[in-house]
A protein has these predicted regions:
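Electropositive, glycine- and tryptophan-enriched low-complexity nucleic-acid-binding patches
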Residues: 59, 77-81, 142-220, 304-318
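Active-site-proximal, Lys/Arg-enriched surface segment
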Residues: 85-175, 289-293
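A short acidic (Asp/Glu
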Residues: 127-130, 233-240, 256-262
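A short, flexible helix-boundary coil/loop motif
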Residues: 1-44, 172-188, 194-204, 209-213, ...
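Acidic, His- and aromatic-enriched active-site or binding-groove loops in soluble protein domains
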Residues: 245-256
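Short, conserved catalytic/metal-binding motifs centered on acidic residues
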Residues: 52, 66-69, 113-127, 155, ...
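Short, positively charged, Gly/Tyr-enriched micro-motifs
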Residues: 33-103, 112, 154, 158-164, ...
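Short amphipathic alpha-helical "interface-anchor" segments enriched in bulky aromatics
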Residues: 20, 117-123, 271, 279, ...
Length: 454
């Protein structure tokens, strides 16, 4: 074994980069090629640029700060050109990487644990007048008013331990700030960016079904699809069932949308006809006590479905399951997991830069949102396979500290060796020292992906 191999073997056992380890496990190079991330005649390898963006997010560094403090950073124009490139398939990159991660955690599932796909949307405030895809009047549940914002419809995966981001679309309504024809980039109609831009005017339900179909076609597996009352329409649920995905949802109490067979056609009428004859069970959610019962009902479009009527004393909530074998108690417990996504959005905003994109060009917004979700998935996976799982916030801070400390320490070590090599007597006595320094420096950069100034 040569000197180079001896040094690399010794360092590999000590110098561990959790980010690169995950990327290697999911075969990120293959995923990049499948998603059309190939190096052009001029420029840097896409893998290296994506790795730098991941480090910026994990280490909580602005792009300008990362460029200033990292010896191996590229110029700012390289990063800007990269996120505006129309040929890259960002959607395929996110779906394939999340599917690969989900395959890695598949052996960790226990019998009886449900794997869930969850469709939800989030509103990210955007004040700028020229941000492509943003709208003037988007209702924010957080601020309880209409605001200037991006409306992001997302498909998420959740189980009893983790959540992952699988896909997303930007939805533009009639209050759009810019028409699609006014977007900055003039794109070829066959480019990936053009195809993605064209979907922006589709309905939420259409976007959701398309995301679900893509995920299933790319190997994402789940037991149930969870949606809120916005998506809970008979035609939507029927299409999800046709894709082989049972649906659990809260229903809107709307007699125009939901009309049942038989004597009692509305949800209120069905509830009134059954409430005195059915055994009621009790439960507690926080400080709220409730009673519920379930019933199998016939629907004109969906056939036999199970409804769960939950009464808190003030409000009547109705849940649907197209799987009629599942118990009412389990339907309620499963639907509660939909709210885990709210914590996921919070982590994305606070830790992974979602909503903080400083771009107005549509292609760049898609790229930065994808990178935020991709980095979230990596950190969530690292947390899942640890023997002592933490909150994502705790793990995020640990990784931030670990990566930066490791990079600075190795840089200092190399500087010390370099100073030693400059002593004439040492060089005479040990001709291999300069080679050792070169090998350590190159291997450290390869394993970390960057070097920090001390």
């Amino acid at each position: 074994m040569g000197l180079d191999n001896y040094i690399q073997t010794a360092m590999r056992s000590i110098l561990k980069n959790p980010i690169l380890e995950v990327l290697s496990e999911i075969k990120i190079t293959k995923i990049l090629k499948q998603s059309n991330f190939v190096k052009r005649e001029v420029g840097y390898p896409p893998f290296q640029i994506i790795l730098h963006f991941v480090y910026m997010l994990v280490m909580n560094k602005r792009q300008s700060t990362f460029i200033k403090n990292s010896e191996n950073a590229f110029g700012k124009d390289a990063y800007y050109r990269f996120i505006k490139e129309s040929r890259y398939n960002w959607r395929k990159f996110l779906i394939l990487s999340s599917a690969a991660i989900l395959q890695r955690i598949k052996p960790l599932h226990k019998n009886g644990e449900h794997r869930l796909l969850i469709i939800d949307d989030t509103v990210e405030p955007k004040r700028g007048k020229f941000i492509e895809g943003s709208c003037k009047y988007v209702w924010s549940n957080k601020e309880h008013k209409s605001i200037n914002a991006l409306n992001i419809v997302s498909l998420n995966y959740a189980d009893s331990h983790s959540t992952f981001q699988v896909d997303f679309s930007i939805k533009m309504n009639d209050s759009k700030r810019k028409e699609i024809s006014e977007f900055t980039s003039k794109l070829h109609h066959r480019s990936n960016s053009y195809q993605r831009k064209s979907e922006i005017i589709k309905s939420k339900n259409t976007l959701a079904i398309e995301m679900l179909e893509r995920a299933l076609n790319n190997g994402v597996e789940a037991d149930y699809l969870l949606v809120d009352s916005w998506y809970a329409k008979p035609n939507f649920i029927e299409k999800a069932n046709e894709l082989g995905m049972p649906v659990i949802s809260r229903l809107p109490n709307n007699k125009l949308i939901w009309n049942f067979k038989g004597k009692h056609k509305t949800m209120n009428a069905i509830y009134e006809s059954l409430k005195n004859s059915r055994h009621k069970s009790g439960g507690q959610h926080g400080k709220i006590s409730y009673k519920y019962f379930d019933a199998i009902i016939e629907h004109a479009v969906l056939g036999k479905i199970k409804l769960v009527f939950l009464h808190t004393g003030k409000d009547l909530l109705v849940f649907i399951s197209t799987d009629i074998t599942i118990a009412g108690k389990e339907i309620i417990a499963t639907y509660k997991k939909r709210w885990n996504i709210e914590q996921g959005y919070k982590d994305l905003r606070n830790l992974f830069g979602l909503g903080k994109e400083e771009n107005r060009i549509y292609e760049a917004l898609i790229a930065k949102i994808t990178l935020s979700m991709f980095t979230y998935n990596i950190v969530s996976y690292i947390n899942r396979i640890k023997h002592e799982p933490q909150t994502l916030g705790e793990l995020f801070r640990d990784l931030e500290c670990e990566l930066e400390t490791l990079a600075i320490s190795m840089q200092l070590f190399i500087q010390i060796l370099t100073k030693i090599s400059e002593i004439q007597n040492v060089v005479k006595d040990n001709k291999d020292l300069l080679q050792i320094i070169a090998v350590i420096s190159a291997f450290t950069q390869k394993e970390l992906g960057f070097m920090c100034e001390s």
